[in-house]
Regions:
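Glycine-rich cofactor phosphate-binding loops and adjacent beta1-alpha1 units
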Residues: 98-101, 135, 141-228
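Glycine-rich beta-strand-centered segment in the early N-terminal region that forms part
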Residues: 1-32, 72-74
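Cysteine-cluster motifs in flexible loop/terminal segments that predominantly coordinate metals
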Residues: 15, 25-66
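Glycine-rich beta-alpha junction loops
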Residues: 22, 26-29, 67, 179, ...
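Mid-domain Rossmann-like dinucleotide-binding core that forms the NAD(H)/NADP(H) cofactor-binding site
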Residues: 67, 72-157, 161
Length: 229
């Protein structure tokens, strides 16, 4: 997550110029062979720079042009910087992985930067209800400003039972924006059950980020309820 000012551009870059304010992202360049190929790690070889990854702890970063996105010069730097990672990660899971549509129901476990971004995008897409799950009442209240229509404090009630009761059977999509084993395992049973027939699939659980080293999932969620993970 970083905000900076462009100091130099390559000959093939036409969307940026020296002096532009820009954010750097983890979005890879467009695939030309059907596969998403990550550029090489940033390094030098025989005193020649090898561009590649995004580095935001240094004074300068050499990145592929597709990683840098122009923003308004007066954009607040502390706010604009998180767009490149947290916002794209949370919002992207809603739009590209789940492909949420209007009136579909959503639950988001964890309302930090990534979770808030998922909630906000679900609101933009007119999902309903949008259920925020966390342990902190203050964060849950804040989530309402981003579009959450309902909240569940998982330290006070069983979130799985609460969401199933709240929705009458489960949500269409559940997102884990925390990455703990307990949330890895909770997001699947809170999705709605499917039924017989290839088109009567159940809800989808979306893990945003890396899973924990271990998790236990009942196979019946897939076999009998046609839920998706």
């Amino acid at each position: 997550e970083g905000f900076g000012v462009v100091t130099q551009v390559g000959s093939n870059v036409d969307h940026l110029k020296e002096g532009d304010a820009a954010i750097v992202t983890w979005v890879p360049r467009e695939p030309i062979n059907g596969r998403w190929n990550a550029p090489p790690a940033g390094a030098t070889w025989q005193e020649e720079p090898l561009a590649g990854s995004t580095y935001t702890w240094g004074e300068d970063a050499i990145v592929w042009g597709g990683y840098a996105v122009k923003v308004d010069d007066d954009s607040p730097r502390d706010l604009a910087s998180i767009v490149g990672c947290a916002v794209l990660t949370g919002a992207g899971a809603v739009t590209h992985t789940a492909k949420v549509r209007p009136e579909e129901s959503v639950a988001v476990f964890g309302v930090g930067g990534v979770g808030m971004s998922a909630i906000q995008m679900a609101s933009v897409l007119q999902a309903y209800p949008i259920i925020a799950v966390d342990l902190d009442d203050a964060k849950l209240e804040f989530a309402k400003e981003f579009g959450a229509t309902h909240t569940v404090n998982a330290s006070k009630v069983d979130p799985v039972e609460a969401i199933i009761e709240m929705t009458g059977g489960g949500v269409d999509y559940a997102f884990d924006a925390i990455g703990l084993r307990i949330t890895n395992e909770q997001i699947l049973p809170v999705t709605r059950s499917g039924g017989s027939g290839a088109e009567n699939i159940g809800g989808m659980a979306v893990l945003i980020g890396m899973p924990g080293p271990e998790m236990t999932i009942w196979p019946g969620h897939f076999m009998f309820h046609q839920r998706q993970y």
